[in-house]
């Protein structure tokens, strides 16, 4: 039976292993309906930074804060791996291509938000991602039933947007009420170090 998980967090379980994209992934679900789901992986930083994006798109950035220039891009998923989007808190600014989500979050795929960021006009929280993850109708429901994913509606923006990527999966698990030991018991295997 279909269940809407929009604006919830998916946490890959130890059953997803040896998958370069989804092993120990934390996914924020932007859309979820009877036709399928779309989400962004938020804990897999890439080597590319916002500075690389500004240079590629010829966005002036001489006055951009250094920490912004060094901000990593995140692999949002395997679909459209060259499309950049910004997951961010709403800040009262209207951008050309913004989809408002729940919990005061939005996703923007237009250049105007990148220009704002280059000018140090920043949302409270933001995460630049390239690509996205997608599930067809019933695919995500089936994967959840197969215990590939833990779903949590315990959204914490500080955890969602922090840069402690090596422990973000574990932090979300703990925020959802799980421990590595409870996963070991649940899945009767060693989950390994995060």
From Swiss-Prot:
Top-rank taxon, per record: Bacteria
Alphabetical list of Pfam families matching this protein: DUF179 (PF02622)
Record-level GO cellular component terms: cytosol
Gene3D superfamilies: VC0467-like (3.40.1740.10), VC0467-like domains (3.30.70.1300)
Family the UniProt entry places it in: Belongs to the UPF0301 (AlgH) family.
HAMAP family in UniProt: UPF0301
Protein name, UniProt field: UPF0301 protein FTL_1216
Originating species: Francisella tularensis subsp. holarctica (strain LVS)
